[in-house]
A protein has these predicted regions:
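Alpha-helical transmembrane bundle of multi-pass secondary transport proteins
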Residues: 1-587
């Protein structure tokens, strides 16, 4: 019984900061506003423009893709609000992992943190193989044919392994790692140069494409009576929005670089919204250009812009687009390789995975061990695995992290916070209104527990709601009754959360309309997760199982937070801010 109690206290302990200790870092703070804005743009700008646009236009949304990109951008913005608040309040490497550690405790933080390196490795491998395929296609598949001729095939098409070892993608990831290892400022300058070149290419595409615009591609009806603008109906536009959402994945790299940003309290929120605003504008402009140039049913799915200009005889612009695609994919890869070791460093620095991975070089101030080990592993994944078999896993890992960050905002907002410099006096954050049933019981729980339970209830309700729509359960009378009960539960939980008092902590940015906006973000993320395949969920649980073995055999005993909490009372009452019981008395 004592052992169970000890384990429970260990897995629920939260990351705490004393005074300004959240600003302490072994890394070098050298990145400014434009550096990290371009870092986020580099992560978001690439495959979303040059590859994804054609697929969504042709198969899902038609010209209404402009609304798909707008809706997806708004959905991404909901999560970005939460990241911006945490980035301003706690500018630490680790991103969602660190924020979950603060809000929900060590075990959930480890689970989220364990998915982040895999997310980056799969994403980087997919981008590297796309870069390799795009470049090889310009050479008429010379590299592929030569490799197969020399080494043979690894497996049959459609298997878990690639049909041939992609040596070019392996070398490309290793090259990016060398750039990253030189230092954050050098890699930021390289990335910024590529972003500027890519934006120039995109403007060339837009200006040149408008010259061939035909508004008949947007108006009128198709031969079978469908709207030219909404050929797949509203459902198609919404389906396209779900696909386009993943074009915005990348703004969280700002939070990953939090320990290397100058003036992070102001810079991170501004860069977050600036990058999303710029990329949303570019997505809408380029998709408008494409659908005005070519009827939606004639858009090429693999190389939409290059083929559109090729059909018009504009070979010069076609080659510029091909170069722009390589630049955009290089952006994706540089920023992805930049973020990967920093996500690992954050967990290692907290003692949850092997401490030697947190080693920072004295000269360049980068986590060199994490760079070497994980980029090498990343390069091997790109070399031999079929990325299409793994890429859907990228979606669930990202949405999983986004959900916990939104929930962590709620937990943190309803905790008491210091009202003086030394943290000896606390405000009334987290106090319950008198009308809340069993008020004394809820207030006797450790800080944030009641809100955490409320968030868990909301997530469960949202998943059930998504299940009823995905399976068609809502079409039956008993399904409609369950929706009614579920809706009532959501209302009651929201009322319970609203019955808590928010803290008065002042920061450079706070999520507006709490708790409604974070809860809306949770709803969107949960619905998208619920529509992923069963196989994807199985892979997630298998990966989590491997991570939990590492945590319970190593991390739980070497956690840095365990050394701060020396008594059961400390552990029980732990919160993000110390001295939570020294609240001021209202007058």
């Amino acid at each position: 019984r004592i052992m169970v109690s000890h384990v429970w206290q260990a897995i629920t302990r939260k990351k705490r900061f004393e005074g300004d200790s959240h600003l302490d870092s072994n890394l070098r703070r050298c990145l400014g506003l434009m550096d990290i804005t371009f870092l986020a743009l580099g992560q978001m700008m690439g495959a979303g423009i040059y590859v994804l646009t054609g697929t969504v236009v042709r198969n899902q949304a038609g010209p209404s893709i402009i609304f798909s990109f707008a809706l997806a951008g708004i959905a991404a913005l909901l999560s970005a609000f939460s990241y911006a608040e945490f980035g301003a309040r706690f500018p630490r490497a680790g991103s969602a992992y660190t924020y979950t550690y603060i809000g929900f405790g060590e075990l959930w933080a480890f689970i989220v943190g364990w998915t982040i390196p895999l997310e980056y490795m799969i994403g980087n491998a997919a981008v590297a193989r796309s870069w390799s395929a795009y470049f090889d296609n310009m050479l008429d598949n010379y590299i592929k044919n030569t490799t197969i001729g020399a080494l043979g095939e690894l497996s049959e098409p459609g298997g878990f392994f690639s049909t041939y070892p992609d040596i070019l993608s392996f070398l490309l990831i290793c090259l990016c790692a060398c750039v990253i290892a030189v230092g954050p400022k050098v890699s930021a300058n390289v990335n910024s140069s590529f972003v500027v070149l890519n934006i120039v290419v995109i403007f060339i595409v837009i200006v040149s494409g408008i010259c061939y615009a035909d508004f008949n591609n947007w108006t009128g009806t198709t031969s079978d009576g469908r709207s030219m603008f909404f050929p797949f109906g509203l459902t198609g536009t919404l389906t396209g929005a779900a696909t386009c959402f993943f074009s915005y994945i990348g703004f969280e790299v700002l939070a990953t670089a939090g320990e290397e940003v100058k003036s992070p309290h102001r810079t991170i929120p501004v860069a977050t919204f600036l990058s999303i605003g710029v990329i949303m504008t570019l997505y809408i402009l380029v998709s408008s250009t494409l659908t005005l140039m070519v009827p939606y049913d004639q858009v090429h799915t693999t190389a939409p812009f290059a083929e559109a200009f090729s059909a018009r005889g504009c070979t010069t612009v076609m080659y510029i687009i091909s170069i722009g695609a390589l630049i955009g994919l290089t952006n994706n890869l540089v920023t992805g390789v930049f973020a990967l070791p920093r996500a690992v460093y954050a967990m290692a620095d907290d003692g949850l995975i092997f401490k030697w991975l947190a080693h920072v070089t004295s000269s360049t101030k980068v986590p060199l061990n994490a760079i070497v080990i994980f980029t090498l592993l990343n390069a091997i994944i790109a070399l031999i695995f079929d990325i299409e078999a793994l890429v859907e896993f990228l979606s669930i890992g990202t949405l999983f992290a986004y959900s916990f960050v939104s929930g962590s905002v709620l937990v943190l907002r309803y905790q008491s916070a210091p009202i003086d410099g030394d943290g000896k006096r606390m405000d009334n954050g987290g106090e319950l209104s008198s009308w809340i049933p069993a008020r004394n019981f809820w207030e006797s729980l450790p800080a944030g527990t009641s809100i955490s339970l409320g968030v868990a209830a909301l997530i469960g309700s949202f998943f059930w709601l998504a299940f009823t729509f995905r399976t068609g359960f809502y079409e039956h009378w008993y399904g409609q009754i369950s929706i009614g009960f579920n809706g009532l539960l959501i209302v009651l939980v929201m009322a319970f959360i609203l019955g808590h008092q928010q803290n008065s902590l002042e920061t450079s940015f706070k999520v507006p309309f709490v708790p409604f906006l974070p809860c809306l973000s949770l709803l969107v993320n949960v619905f998208m997760m619920a529509y992923l395949t069963t196989a994807t969920w199985i892979r997630l649980f298998v990966w989590m199982g491997v991570g939990l073995l590492i945590y319970f055999s190593y991390g739980i005993r070497h956690s840095k937070e365990a050394k701060k909490l020396t008594t059961i009372a400390d552990i029980r009452m732990s919160s993000t801010f110390p001295n939570k019981n020294n609240r001021i008395t209202k007058t």
